[in-house]
Curated annotation (Swiss-Prot):
Species this protein is from: Xenopus laevis (African clawed frog)
Region of interest: Disordered: 1-80
Chief subcellular location: nucleus
Domain observations: The flexible hinge domain, which separates the large intramolecular coiled coil regions, allows the heterotypic interaction with the corresponding domain of SMC5, forming a V-shaped heterodimer.
Residues annotated as transmembrane: none
Gene3D superfamilies per the UniProt record, alphabetical: P-loop containing nucleotide triphosphate hydrolases (3.40.50.300)
Keywords: ATP-binding, Chromosome, Coiled coil, DNA damage, DNA recombination, DNA repair, Nucleotide-binding, Nucleus, Telomere
GO BP field: cellular senescence; double-strand break repair via homologous recombination; telomere maintenance via recombination
Assembly with partners or alone: Forms a heterodimer with smc5. Component of the SMC5-SMC6 complex which consists at least of smc5, smc6, nsmce2, nsmce1 and nsmce4a.
Gene field: smc6
Name of the protein this chain belongs to: Structural maintenance of chromosomes protein 6
GO cellular component term of the entry, any: nucleus
Length: 1128
């Protein structure tokens, strides 16, 4: 067998024919999987053409491949002539009508074989085809090999020498630099081969070896591109049928052979598929038969073998028990190792909690110191404030006394000034008045004065009554306004509670179908988003929540207490890690764009509840929050233990009993706080009342809650209506009283208006008196004394005014100081309040941190105890293992590795014992049954293997053929494009224009050519051309095919038979040019023309044939209808 240039083996053509008949492996899988289709079935040629076909998917790629191929030829032509496959010489004896021709020694590049008709040119070409294994029908000179033997002779002999040099030589160590193919033809139609080395030694006489050589050299004698006879040219090239031209192209490029190969493969696949179907039915029958034979075979199994098997099973049983014990110990050891690895984690948690406790205690001390400092400041400011307040009160008293004294002196001054004026008037009147006033005038004045005083008294009484009425109505209006403000506040509270109850009622109605609506309108959407994210794998562990939805009450009366205890934790969610927390935060930001979001707690998920027995509180009559609840998930329980310490909080229904237990007596151990049935929070030294009066989240009877809320809504509606009526009534009373008050104020003003003229009249009447009997001098003395008193009083007024101003200044200063200290005390109180809240929060934080630390300390203790317990269990199991090993060694000293369980072995031992007992009773023809069973099993396995193999082969073949056919189409396109390029280029050398049209669908090829300039006339079909022009176009077509097909030599018979001198000259130049560019190929051109005009060059060799013998006009060829040759 030959090898390719890369060293891989090449299957001879005879082997390829065999492979067609074998369905199992008709193609080399590696070649099909890695390369495209090739021109022929020959592996050597496929390898060469594959280089040109790879990656040829676009027109630009084809152009690149053409230019690349041209550059390769130029490179090859410059490097020298071909080393392998070219024909060095041909020798003929008794062939056709020639006794002896040759030997003809051909040059490595261009060879012209010239001679007259009948000189033997075509005989040489025919001998080349036949001598290299071609069929007689290919030559078109006969249908049988025996027709080539010269008439009158018994045999004919053909000897062809091929070059075998260079690195691509075929078995150079065996054949040397040349291979001589010697073939002997006999008249009985047989032929024999001799393959000789360069030394003349016969190496082989097998045709397979010749086929391997041809494959290696890529020689295709049946390819019209390699060897084109006159008859082939007439049939295909000169034919006017476009289908014939297309067939010629397909045959020349070996695409036809590939297409036939593909069709044959698909037919083979179809037949194989039918065989598989038939084999499947046959396989089922064989399987059933095999099962039946196997059952009979098992039923008569040798007792000795069964007993041996029984002993073997007993040995395995002994060591299986050992293996199972070892397997039981292994997880304990691994668990101990794992648990010991987790010890560090608990210690780290304890250290972390200790650090948090220290930090929290430092915060507590800092807040306590801050509060103490504020308290000391407040205590220090309090006496100062009291002193300043007393000082203000004293100064205000002094100022008020000085103001009273000042007003008294001022009134005294006004009285004295009025008296002085009256004395002055009196003296003047006395001086001017006469002593003749009558008694009747005096009495009349006195009577008028009395009447005026009576009227004044009535007006004074009326003024007093009016003042009393004004005071009463002012107080009534103030009371009404206070009542109205109180009603407004209660009305707003009722309205707020009314809206809250309506919202709760709506949530309760919705919770009848979706309980989660109790936790807010957004909660169902949030949980749906969490479920969706969990399905998409965005959480490591799905968050749990809301926590309130995961808890249930054992006693419904404790609902308000539990809700007051857990508060915001009822809405919280728990995450296993911070990555899940961030994802949940993102989801919440979408579902809760505004307002408060539920709290997220990060706590590692574990599948069991903490053991809190050591730190939990206990009371015989009252449960803790933990024991009062039924919780769905251990993660929720652990979260509430960590965040709220529910194991340390009691629920005591009664208020008084709660105070008694928590404050008047020592509370139970580990109890920090308690909650009453009404939701009040009770500490050892504090008591906080609950704002809520009813549970909203944990209530179980929704209908009762709805009924209760509807009743309260009706009550609130009634209360709202009552308050609105009262408000309207009060507003009306206020309006009426304010109207009456305005009337009394107007009446008071009118009284003052009425009094003023009366006072003036009485003053006037009192000044008109009788002339007194006293002396005017006395009145003047009184006036002088009165003036002195006025001066003294004025001095007292000034002193009182000055003193009052000084006291006012002192009072203002004292009030400013007092206001400042009040502001300081108020600011200290304001600062102290948030500090107290922070102190309470930090206190809770300290307690939580200590509780966490205690929790992890207890967990560490439990963890270490668990490890110790596991170690003790392992030690006990290891002792048991030692006992089992010693027992197993007594049964079977050497250990057996057993993969089965002891239980399955025990079952089989019992079954085998029963079978042995039954077989000891029954006997049969054991040998025949065993033989039948083995035969049936072999048949079944053989058919099963073949069916499986064929199924795999069909599947692989489908995949390969799909890829190969795609590559075949791409390769055909590449060859078509390259052929068009070369054809157009060759025509242009004669100034012709033309094109080749390929129709692969209809399998036609049309050539249109226009002699002369292409733009002067339309393209014409070759039928319109002259004989010389048509021959020239045909040569261009041939040369185009030469450019795309691979073969070491080309043979062309009478290519210029119909050409004129000009076209012959141009065609010759084109062939020589191509030969010069392809020096690695050999060209053998047969022509009857005289080649004396050829240029003298070392590349061209002319072989002239002798003229035929006189009288010889025809060659003794046999008719085509004679019997076909025997290929073997």
């Amino acid at each position: 067998m030959g090898k390719r240039k890369d060293g891989s083996p090449i299957a001879p053509s005879s082997q390829r024919k065999k492979q067609r008949q074998e369905v199992d492996d008709p193609y080399d899988e590696e070649d099909y999987g890695q390369a495209g289709p090739s021109v022929s079935n020959d592996y050597g040629q496929r390898k060469k053409q594959r280089k040109e076909a790879d990656n040829s998917h676009t027109d630009s790629d084809y152009e690149n491949s053409v230019s690349c191929a041209s550059s390769q030829r130029v490179s090859a032509s410059q490097s020298g002539t071909g080393d392998v496959g070219i024909i060095e010489s041909i020798f003929l004896r008794n062939f056709m009508c020639h006794s002896m021709l040759g030997p003809f020694r051909f040059g490595p590049n261009v060879n012209f074989v010239i001679g007259n008709n009948g000189s033997g040119k075509s005989a040489v070409l025919t001998a080349l085809i036949v001598g290299l294994g071609g069929k007689a029908a290919i030559t078109n000179r006969g249908s049988s090999i025996k027709g080539f033997v010269k008439e009158g002779q018994t045999f004919a002999e053909i000897s062809i020498t091929l070059r075998n040099r260079g690195q691509d030589a075929y078995k150079p160590d065996v054949f040397g630099n040349s291979i001589t193919v010697q073939q002997r033809l006999t008249t009985d139609g047989s032929r024999t081969y001799k393959l000789k080395s360069a030394t003349g030694a016969v190496v082989s006489n097998k045709k397979e070896e010749l086929t391997a050589i041809l494959d290696h050299f890529n020689i295709q004698v049946d390819n019209p591109v390699s060897v084109l006879t006159q008859e082939m040219s007439k049939h295909f090239l000169q034919s006017k049928n476009e289908s014939d031209k297309y067939k010629f192209f397909m045959k020349a490029t070996q695409l036809e052979q590939m297409k036939e190969d593909y069709s044959y493969i698909m037919e083979t696949k179809s037949r194989t598929h039918d065989q598989v179907e038939n084999g499947g039915e046959r396989l089922r029958d064989l399987r059933q038969e095999c099962i039946q034979k196997e059952e009979r075979f098992k039923s008569i199994a040798s007792l000795g073998e069964m007993k041996e098997k029984l002993e073997d099973l007993k040995n395995k049983m002994a060591w299986a028990l050992v293996t199972e014990s070892e397997k039981q110990i292994k997880p304990f050891i691994e668990q101990i190792s794992t648990e010991e690895g987790r010890t560090v984690k608990y210690e780290q948690k304890i250290e972390e909690c200790q650090g948090k406790v220290i930090n929290a205690e430092e915060k507590f001390r800092a807040k306590q110191e801050e509060l103490d400092k504020i308290t000391q400041e407040a205590v220090a400011l309090k006496p100062q404030g009291i002193g300043l307040k007393e000082d203000v009160q004293k100064k205000r008293k002094s100022y008020n006394e000085s103001e009273v004294l000042y007003n008294r002196h001022r009134m005294e001054l006004k009285r004295l000034e009025r008296d002085a004026e009256q004395l002055h008037k009196r003296i003047e009147e006395l001086k001017k008045s006469a002593d003749n006033d009558s008694e009747s005038e005096k009495m009349a004045r006195q009577k008028e004065i009395n009447q005026i005083r009576e009227r004044m008294k009535a007006l004074h009484d009326k003024d007093i009554t009016t003042n009393q009425q004004i005071h009463q109505f002012q107080q009534a209006i103030e009371k009404y306004k206070e009542e109205r403000a109180r009603i407004g506040n209660e009305e707003r509270n009722i309205k707020q509670r009314l809206e809250q109850h309506k919202r709760q009622l709506k949530e309760l109605h919705e919770s009848k179908t979706d309980r989660l609506k109790r936790f807010g309108q957004n909660m169902p959407a949030l949980l749906a988003a969490i479920d969706e994210a969990d399905k998409l794998g965005r959480f490591r562990k799905k968050p749990v929540g809301p926590l309130g939805a995961c808890i249930h009450l054992k006693d419904q009366e404790l609902a308000l207490a539990v809700e007051s205890c857990l508060k915001g934790l009822m809405f919280a969610f728990c995450c296993d890690n911070h990555q899940d927390e961030r994802m949940l935060q993102n989801i919440m930001s979408r579902e809760y764009p505004r307002g408060r979001r539920p709290q997220i707690i990060v706590n590692e998920f574990i599948d069991h509840v903490y053991d809190v027995r050591q730190r939990a509180t206990f009371h015989p009559d009252h449960p803790t929050v933990l024991t009062a609840l039924e919780i769905d998930h251990p993660v929720v329980t652990n979260c509430l233990i960590d965040m709220r310490g529910i194991e340390t909080i009691l629920i005591i229904k009664g208020k008084d009993e709660a105070r008694e237990i928590m404050q008047k007596r020592a509370p139970p151990r580990n109890c920090r706080e308690a909650f009453t049935g009404e939701g009040d929070q009770v500490y050892t030294n504090r008591y906080y009342s609950s704002d809520s009066r009813r549970a909203t989240l944990l209530s179980r009877d929704v209908e009762a809650e709805i009924s209760h809320l509807e009743k309260e809504l009706r009550n609130f509606g009634s209360q709202m209506a009552t308050f609105q009526q009262r408000a309207q009534s009060v507003d009306k009373d206020i309006k009426e009283n304010e109207g009456i008050l305005r009337q009394y104020h107007n009446s008071k003003k009118q009284i003052q208006i009425d009094l003023r003229p009366l006072l003036e009249r009485i003053s006037e009447l009192e000044n008109v008196e009788e002339q007194p009997s006293i002396d005017i001098a006395t009145l003047e003395g009184e006036a002088e004394e009165n003036l002195n008193k006025i001066e003294l009083v004025k001095q007292e007024v000034e002193l009182a005014k000055e003193k009052m101003g000084n006291l006012k200044s002192f009072l203002t200063t004292a009030e400013i100081n007092y206001e400042e200290i009040k502001k300081k005390i108020s600011s200290v109180a304001e600062v102290a309040e948030p500090v107290k809240e922070d102190l309470h929060r930090v206190d809770q934080e300290v307690e939580n941190c200590k509780r966490h630390r205690k929790h992890y300390e207890e967990k560490l203790k439990e963890h270490l105890d668990r490890i110790q317990k596991r170690k003790e269990e392992v030690a006990a199991k290891e002792q048991e293992l030692e006992v089992k090993i010693s027992q197993a060694k007594c049964i079977c000293p050497e250990r057996i590795e057993v993969s089965r369980t002891a239980r399955s072995l025990d079952t089989e031992i019992n079954r085998l014992r029963e079978k042995i007992n039954s077989e000891e009773v029954l006997h049969g023809n054991r040998e025949e049954i065993i033989k039948q069973y083995h035969e049936a099993k072999e048949r079944y396995q053989d058919v099963e293997g073949k069916v499986k193999h064929l199924k795999r082969f069909i599947k692989l073949l489908d995949e390969i053929m799909a890829q190969r056919y795609k590559s075949y189409q791409q390769f055909r396109r590449c060859l078509t494009f390259r052929c068009k390029i070369y054809f157009d280029s060759l025509l242009s050398q004669r100034a012709y224009s033309g094109k080749i049209n390929f129709d692969h669908k209809n399998e036609t090829l049309s050539i249109t050519v226009q002699p002369g300039e292409g733009n002067k006339a339309a393209l014409s079909d070759m039928k319109c051309l002259s004989g010389g022009e048509r021959s020239f176009s045909t040569v261009c077509f041939i040369l185009s095919l030469w450019s795309i097909a691979e073969s070491p030599f080309r043979c062309l018979d009478e290519f210029d038979v119909y050409m004129d001198m000009v076209n012959r000259r141009i065609s010759m130049d084109m062939m020589l040019s191509m030969a010069d560019s392809q020096r690695f190929r050999q060209f053998i051109l047969l022509t009857p023309q005289n080649m004396s005009s050829l240029p003298s060059t070392s590349l061209v060799r002319i072989l002239r044939m002798k003229d035929p013998e006189r009288g010889q006009t025809t060659l003794p060829f046999q008719p085509l209808n004679q019997e076909a040759e025997d290929e073997e």
